[in-house]
C-alpha cells in the first residue's frame, strides 16, 4: 500500500501548492524513492480541454493524450516520472464514472450518494494512480472551505482513518500575510484555515507557511501552539528569487525527514543529492549572456496560458547560461501594423492557439521573421501560420489559409485531420460535427526526421517522439507544390501521412523551424529540450552578428 501525502491549501488560492508538492517530490526522488504525483480538481468539467485559456490557463498534455491541469506540468518539470490521465482527476470525471456505473446497474439498485459512492470512486482513482510507488503526493485543488472540494476532503479523511498516520500524511499550505502598516506577520488566517480543516476531521501533520519573508521562530511556535502541529513541522516558505531553488530550501528545513520518519522509510532512502538543482539555480543567478525573445500569441494577457512555453524557453537558456527575456505580444495587435514591436528582438516564437482571432497577426509575424532573417520557432498554430505565410508570399497561392479560419479558401493548405493513428496503433476519426472535448490528435507520437535538415541536426537522431494537441494539419495535396517552392518538410509521421516539421533551407534563413507538436511539454530545467536549446542558441548567434557560438552548459 503506497504511502500518500495529501496537499491542501488554505486562506487564498494560487499560493503554490503544486510547486511545493513537486519540490518535496523531487527531494524524495533524490533520496532514491520511486515517486508519483496526482491532482484532484474540484471543477465539474471532465477535463480542462474545452476550458478557456483566459480562465484556466494552459492545458497540459501527457504521453497518453490526457488534457490536464497545468500543475501536471509543474510535476513533470520537477520529477522524472512521466504522468498519465490517471494522475489528473476532476469532479466531472468522478461523476461521469459513477453515473456510468449506475446506468449499467453496478450499484444493484442502491440510492447513489456522495457518501459512499462518490468518495469511493475518488479513493479508487487514487489507488489506481499510486499503486506500485514508494510514495505519492496528491494535491487537492482549490481552497479549504470551498463547497466543491468537500467530497475530495471527505475521501482523504476516510483514507487516513483506514490506513493510519504511517500510510497517509496531511500537508497544508497556508498564507501568513505581512501587514506593512503593523510591520508584522499575521498568523490568524492560518489558525482559522486549520480550524476549518479540523472541523471536517482533518488534522494537518505539516504546515507550509507562505509569506513574503521568512517566518521567524517565535511565529512558528505560535502557529504550532494554536494548530496542534509540531513546531518542527511548521515550515517557512518565503518568496524566493528562483522557484527551482525550492527543493533546496525545503531540504534545508528538513521537510523530507518528516516524511521519512512518519512513513518509516529510513531503510529505503539515501542522502539527497540535489546538485542538479543547485546547478540550475546557479545558472539562473549567474548568466553569461542574455537574449530577447518575442512570444506572439493569442492569450498573452493571461501568461499561464503559455506556462510550459515560457518555462521551456528559460530551460533552453539555462543549458547555455543565458538569460531569456520574454516580450509578450498580442498577435491581433500586429495585424496591419508596421511590425516595429519586433525591432531589436533576437528571436520570435509563435505558440499554439485556436480560432481565427489573431491568426493574420501570426502569419504577418512569420513573414517578418522570414524576410528579416530573425530566428523563428513556430509551435502548432505557429507552424500553420508559417505554412500559410509561405504559401501566400513565396509559392504564390493567393488567399491560402486554414479551413479552421476560412472554409472557402481556394488554397486550404491547412485542413481538418479526419483520420490518424494513435501511439497505441489505433485509428481515430472525426469530422466537423464531432464534439470538441477529447477529439483532437493527442499525446505522444513518433516522427521521422529528414537527413541533412535543421531538425535532424538539432535533435541529433532520426526518430523522435513529441506530444500533440491539434485538430488541423498540413494539407498533403500541397506538399509537392510547397516543396517545389523551397519549403523543406523535415519531419513526417512514421506512416508518412502527416507533416510534423517544416523549415527553410539554411541558405535562405539561418534558423526557421516550425513543428506541429508541442515540444514545450517535454522540456525540464535539468535537461532542457533540443528545439528550445537550438532556438535560444540561434537567438544568441543573431545577437552576436551571426557568429557561431560555443555552447556554455549549466
Curated annotation (Swiss-Prot):
Pathway: Pyrimidine metabolism; CTP biosynthesis via de novo pathway; CTP from UDP: step 2/2
Binding sites annotated in the UniProt record for CTP: 13, 146-148, 186-191, 222
Domain Glutamine amidotransferase type-1: 292-545
Pfam families: CTP_synth_N, GATase
Function: Catalyzes the ATP-dependent amination of UTP to CTP with either L-glutamine or ammonia as the source of nitrogen. Regulates intracellular CTP levels through interactions with the four ribonucleotide triphosphates.
HAMAP family attached to this UniProt entry: PyrG (MF_01227)
Protein name (Swiss-Prot/TrEMBL): CTP synthase
Biological source species: Xanthomonas euvesicatoria pv. vesicatoria (strain 85-10)
Name of encoding gene: pyrG
